[in-house]
C-alpha cells in the first residue's frame, strides 16, 4: 500500500467515526494501550517504557517476562557513535515487538542543565547538537523495525524538583539554541512517530497546554505529523490541552476527556477541527505500525538473543570513559599479575541502570566479580572486601540470595490475605511494581499479596531488613514482625513520590540456619499503581575500610568499584550533592594510601567530585552499562576493548562551579534559566572556570596526531556550506578509535556567543600507524544564533574560527574564515 493509499484509508476511517469515537481515540484505554473501535476494525496500539529496554506491561523488578537491558542514555551517548546508537535503537525496536508494543517511550533527550538532575543518566548530554545526533540515530534504529519512537520530554523537564508544577522560565533564544534542537532533529531528520509532553510549565504555561510550543513550533514549524501524548497523568485540562495540540492523554481510563470533551465540543469550547486532527494522527500511527493488518494479540515474550547480548556488551564498553591512566597502569596484563584486590560496594553488585520508569527486569546480569573471576581464572588470586556501602535505602534482596533462587508470590482478592489464593507466581527479586497490569484473576481495586522464601545467611550477627511500598506492607522472619509499614506509612521520595519512607528493622541471625521470610502487602489507599520493595543488609564489619586497605597493601593491583545507583539517581527526585554516597571517598583515599596501584571504576550517571583523584593511578567512568555490566568493565580493564568514550557533560571541581547553581532548583514555583545559552562547557569556557574534566574528554590506550587542517574556502558566501578536512594518525602500536570534535567560534559577533560550540564530530577506527582523512561539514545554520527580535536564525558576517580537537579543551588544530554577508535563515 502506498503512502497516499494509507492516508486515504485514514481519511476514510475518520469520516466514519462518531464524535464519541474520535474522542475515545484521544485517551488511553488502560495504562499501556489506546482505545480500540471494533466496529470499524480499528485496533488499539500498545506502548512500552524504554529507553534502555522495552519492559512491556509487567513489573520492572523480577518479572518472569524479562527484557534486554541496554546501557543508559548517557552511556550510549558517551560512545559518540551514531551507527552504534542506531544499532541499539533497532535492537530495542525488536525488543518492543516481543512485548507486543507498537511504540517505545524513548528516547529521553532533555539537556543536562544541572549535574544534580535525577534523570541525567537517562538523557544524553549538556550539548544540544550531540543530544540531537544521538536522538536521530536512536529513533532511526527503533523505527527501522516499524516500531514508533516517542521522543521526550517536551520541553525543559531538566530537573525532578517539583516537576509537576514548576515553571521553567527562559528566553526564546535559550529555548531555541539549547533545549529545542534535539526535538527539532527528532522530527525533521528522524521523522519520529511520537513526542511526549513534559509535566512542567514553560514560562507559566503547562507543556501539554502550550499552543506556542505544541502547535506553533512542533507541528507547524517543524512539520511533526505523529502523535503528541502526555506524560503519565500529565494532562492538565480538557479544553486547553485539546485545543492547543495534545493528541493523546495517557494513561487510561481518561480523567479529562471522554464525556467532558464531547460536551466541550458540543458547546463550542473545543473546535471540532482539533478533535479531527487528533483522531487523524492516532489513525495515522496505527496505519504506520501495521496494526490494522497485525494487531497485537500475542502474550508478551522474553527472547534473550545472543546478538543483543553482544551488542549490549559492545555499546557499554564503547561508551566507558578512561579519565586517568598514570604510567599506563591500564590495560591490566594477566601474566604480569599474581593478585588483584577487588574492593567496594559495586564489586558483587551489578549497577545496570538508574531508577524510575526506565527500569526493566533484565534477562540476566553479571557482576564485576563474576566476570573478573572468569577472565583471570586460576592464574591470578582475587581478594574481596566491601569496604563500605553506597545505598540510599537498603539494597534490594535478590532471588539469588535466597534458597531455591526464587521468591513465591501469592495474590488474594481482599485486603486481609485470606480465603483462597487467586494466583501465584515466582519472582526473581524482592521488589514488585505493578504499572496497570496485574496477574490473571486478581482484582486490581482490592487485593493483597504475600512474598515468601526461605533464607540461609552466610554470616552471624545483626541483619537488617527494610520495606518501602505504595500501599501497606509488613515483613516477618519466622512469624516475628521485623518491619512494620502497615500500621502507618509516611510519604517519601520512592516510586515517583507515591511511595513511603523506608522502614528498617533488624534481627540477629545465625550463619547456616534456615529462616522463613514473609512480606505481606495490600493495595489500600493506592493512587495509581502498587509497589513494594524488600531491602536487606548483612552485617558489615566496623573496620571494613581498614580490612580493605590491608587487602590492598598485599595485592599487586587494587580495583575499587564505587558509585551511585538507581536510588540516588532516579526519576522523581534530584540528587542533593556531587559527593559519592556514604564512605566511598574515604575508602578510596585509604586504599590508595595502602597501594598506589589503585584504579577506581566509577559507576554514576552524572558527575561526582573526586577529592581523591591525585592519589589513584587510574579512573574509569563505567556509568550504568546494562545487563553486561561486569563483562563490559572487564573488557576495558584488560584491553579487550580499547576505551574510546568521551564525556558528554562537564565534570566540575565543585558543585558551586556549575552554571545552574545559582538558580537551582527554583523557588515560588519558578526556576529561572539565568545562565541562558551558557550551559555546560559553554559557561566554563566563557567564564574561564577550570573543570575537573572538560566536555568531550576521554583517554585511550592509543595516541592520535592531528594535522593538515584545511577549509574549503576562506571566504564563505551566504547560504553555502563549508568543507573542513584534516588527517588523523594513530601514532601508537595499538588499534583504537578516536572522536574528532569540531567547534565553532564567532569571533566578531554583535551578541554574546560561546567561545566554542560543538557543530560536527565523527568517530574513526585506526590501525597502528594508519592515517585517515576526516571530512566534516558546516552548514549555514551551524554559524547562526537565534535573534529574539527577528524571531529567526541569523548568521552574521565576519570572522569565524574552526577548532578541531580531542575534547573541548584539547584543541589540536585551528583555522579561520570570513562569512561574507549577514543573513536570516528560514
Predicted segments with their positions:
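Glycoside hydrolase catalytic-domain context in secreted enzymes
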Residues: 1-785, 792-809, 825
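Short beta-strand elements
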Residues: 810-825
